[in-house]
Amino acid sequence: MTSYNVVRFKVKSGQDQAFLDAHRNAPKIEGLCDASVIKTGDRTYCIIGKWDSMDKLAAARPQMIALLDSFRHTLEDLGGGLGVTDPVSGDVVVSLNHA
């Protein structure tokens, strides 16, 4: 079953390019079908990842944490006890195809 993860970030002033480069240069992660980085505002971004399954996503967590550690210095704390990321993930329950 297809799964997705979404992670919200806020980048420190002047660190946008380093943040984006870290994602452009990220190694291939098994089970990750597709990912996009979306600019949601001034220095704010979300990454959306499409996965083969929740099992593949869970197995990739060590790689995702290693990737995060490579650009953690570019991120601001989001506040409210979240730290530098606000992640959610889950299985697809409705799929729409308007192509």
Which stretches of residues belong to each language-model region?
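Short amphipathic alpha-helices within nucleic acid-binding modules
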Residues: 17, 54-63
